[in-house]
From Swiss-Prot:
It comes from Drosophila mojavensis. InterPro entries: Emp24-like (IPR015720), GOLD_dom (IPR009038). The chain crosses the membrane at residues 173-193. Keywords: Developmental protein, Membrane, Signal, Transmembrane, Transmembrane helix. The keyword Nucleotide-binding does not apply. One of its GO terms (cellular component) is membrane. Residues 1-20 form the signal peptide. GO terms for biological process: dorsal/ventral pattern formation; endoplasmic reticulum to Golgi vesicle-mediated transport. Residues 194-206 are cytoplasmic. The keyword Membrane applies. Pfam families: EMP24_GP25L (PF01105). The gene is bai. This is Transmembrane emp24 domain-containing protein bai.
Length: 206
């Protein structure tokens, strides 16, 4: 039982890693990282940028509507956190600024983000509740399992919404096609009748 629980915990830990990225930011440019986040989910992150005299980097976190959730200027090393209000694609942007008289060079930026259950401090929970190490691991396993179930439920819901949207779109396209064919048929009939009357008036046909 113990070995099975630890094995499952190890597997879940492998498929639920921290989001870590490192990149080089050219001078006077910006790079944005986007990720879909569920509603009412805590997001935490740590960043560090290489120091270049005379150059500065700002960061800003915002949603698709442009609402600013977190920002800071002239960053070097630090942390940030924000809470998502709705399911949305959130982005974190790093912006390089170099004076016109200075020849800029690329700066190295490293970012580590955590969200949802990843942000919990299980060591603190274990100490506060006086839990044994195994009980703390089982608590982490339970939270990870619940989080995965919620993610799959959300994915299924979004799949159903997209399928409903596709079905509605297909129905509208079919209706529009039938309507267009009826209009063309009506126009063709009107043209035939009009030309028939015209030719009769000109006595070109009987």
């Amino acid at each position: 039982m113990l070995k099975s629980a630890l094995a499952i915990l190890t597997i879940l830990g492998c498929i639920w890693p921290l989001h870590s990225v490192m990149f080089h930011l050219p001078p006077n440019t910006q790079k944005c990282l986007k990720e879909d986040i569920q509603a009412n989910q805590l997001v935490m992150g740590e960043y560090e940028v290489s120091d270049v005299p005379g150059q500065v980097i700002d960061y800003i976190a915002r949603d698709t509507k442009g609402h600013i959730l977190s920002q800071k200027e002239h960053i070097t090393k630090g942390k940030f956190s924000f809470m998502s209000e709705v399911y949305d694609a959130y982005e974190i942007c790093f912006i390089s600024k170099v004076p016109p008289h200075q020849r800029g060079i690329s700066q190295e930026v490293s970012l580590v983000t955590k969200k949802g259950v990843e942000t919990k401090s299980y060591e603190g929970i274990g100490e506060a509740s006086k839990l044994k190490p195994l009980e703390v691991d089982l608590k982490r396993l339970e939270d990870l399992s619940d989080s995965i179930v919620r993610d799959f439920a959300l994915m299924r819901k979004r799949e159903e919404e997209m399928r409903d949207t596709n079905e509605k779109t297909n129905s509208r396209v079919l209706f529009f096609s039938i309507f267009s064919m009826c209009c063309l048929l009506g126009l063709a009939t009107w043209q035939v009748l009009y030309l028939r009357r015209y030719f009769k008036a000109k006595k070109l046909i009987e």
